[in-house]
Each structure stands twice: as structure tokens, then as C-alpha cells.
A protein has these predicted regions:
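Conserved ATP-binding subdomain of kinase catalytic cores across diverse folds
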Residues: 2-108, 112-129, 145, 176-178, ...
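Catalytic activation segment of kinase domains across protein kinase-like and atypical kinase folds
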Residues: 127, 133-183
């Protein structure tokens, strides 16, 4: 086996990717496209379980498919696990949306979609811990956008969130979104 970063191009699908701390690649299998994220086994299993539980609550997230473990390179050294999720058809990361000529109010509509997602997640007891435009995918929904959670590795599903947890997510969202929009305005697409 090979680290995900060295998989041959003929196995991969060239789709727009957001910014990630981890190696993420898209693979075509049959009629479906899957996102592969290389992370530690514990994080992969925890994120898989969180996404599965959020899906059962009918919240807008990517669909978790599997965690691939027990991988080794040709020298027998262990490789990180891979979290496999189903790619959300027709979705785009925010940077890909801004790379196109869009309406001037696009940023506002994306932030609105992210706010709706965060409220829905909070009402279900999900503490995100890393709210940002980078951790969601967007689908066009008539004249607006819908946001879908793609990165749940810092999250936690609880019975109820504390006021402090909600405030932290809101403050972090504000900070991260300002930074992401500043990056875009400086031309750092």
C-alpha cells in the first residue's frame, strides 16, 4: 500500500478540494465518488461514528462509508487510517465558489447557510469546535445555498450544549470566517 498522497493519478478524480490539515483525495468507484481522508485510526473511527450518528438524526452531513485500518507500506511500516465518505454530488467548497464569477452577495449567502447548519447542529446537541467555511460543502438551493458538514473530527454529540459551548462555536465561526474572507480578498485562493 501507499500513503494517500502518492496514489496514482489514474485512481483519482480531480474535484475541487477545500483546505485541509490532512491529505484528502477523491476516488471513483463504479458510479460513485468517495472522499478519502488520511488520519490517525482513533480520529478516523471517532469522526466516522459522529458522522453516522448525525446522519441518523437527519442532519446535513456527508455520508460516512468506512474506516480503512491496518494499512502498511511496502517496507511493512504502518500507514495512517483512511476515513471514507461519499462525495456529495454537485457540492463545492467555498473557495471553488469564489473562484467563479458570482453575485456580490455570495459571501452573505454562504455565511447564512453556515449559520443555519450551525443552529441545526447545536439544536441536536452537536458541539462543533472548529466552525469554518472550510469545514463544509455548499449546494446551490434555488437562490440560496445549503451547507453540509464534512469535517467533524473536533466535534462532540451531547444531550445538550452549554451556553459556553454555543458561544465558543459562534466566536470561533466569526474569527475563522473573517480570516477566510480576508484570504480570499487578498487573492489567496
Amino acid at each position: 500500500e501507499k500513503p494517500l498522497a502518492t496514489w496514482p493519478e489514474d485512481l483519482l478524480v480531480n474535484l475541487p478540494r477545500g483546505i485541509s490539515r490532512h491529505v484528502v483525495r477523491f476516488v471513483h468507484v463504479g458510479d460513485e465518488v468517495y472522499a478519502m481522508k488520511e488520519i490517525t485510526r482513533n480520529v478516523a473511527e471517532r469522526e466516522y461514528e459522529l458522522l453516522r450518528r448525525l446522519q441518523k438524526l437527519e442532519l446535513p452531513t456527508v455520508q460516512p462509508i468506512a474506516v480503512v485500518t491496518g494499512r502498511h507500506n511496502a517496507q511493512g511500516e504502518p500507514l495512517e487510517a483512511i476515513l471514507v465518505t461519499k462525495h456529495l454530488k454537485f457540492s463545492l467548497p467555498y473557495r471553488a465558489l469564489f473562484a467563479r464569477n458570482l453575485r456580490p452577495d455570495t459571501a452573505e449567502r454562504l455565511i447564512d447557510a453556515l449559520a443555519v447548519l450551525m443552529v441545526r447542529l447545536h439544536l441536536a446537541g452537536f458541539y462543533w469546535g472548529d466552525v469554518s467555511l472550510s469545514n463544509v460543502l455548499f449546494l446551490r438551493d434555488a437562490d440560496a445555498f445549503s451547507a453540509f458538514l464534512v469535517d467533524a473530527e473536533t466535534g462532540d454529540l451531547q444531550v445538550n450544549l452549554t451556553e459556553g459551548q454555543r458561544e465558543y462555536d459562534v466566536d470561533l465561526a466569526r474569527t475563522n470566517i473573517i480570516g477566510e474572507l480576508m484570504d480570499l480578498s487578498s487573492g489567496a485562493l
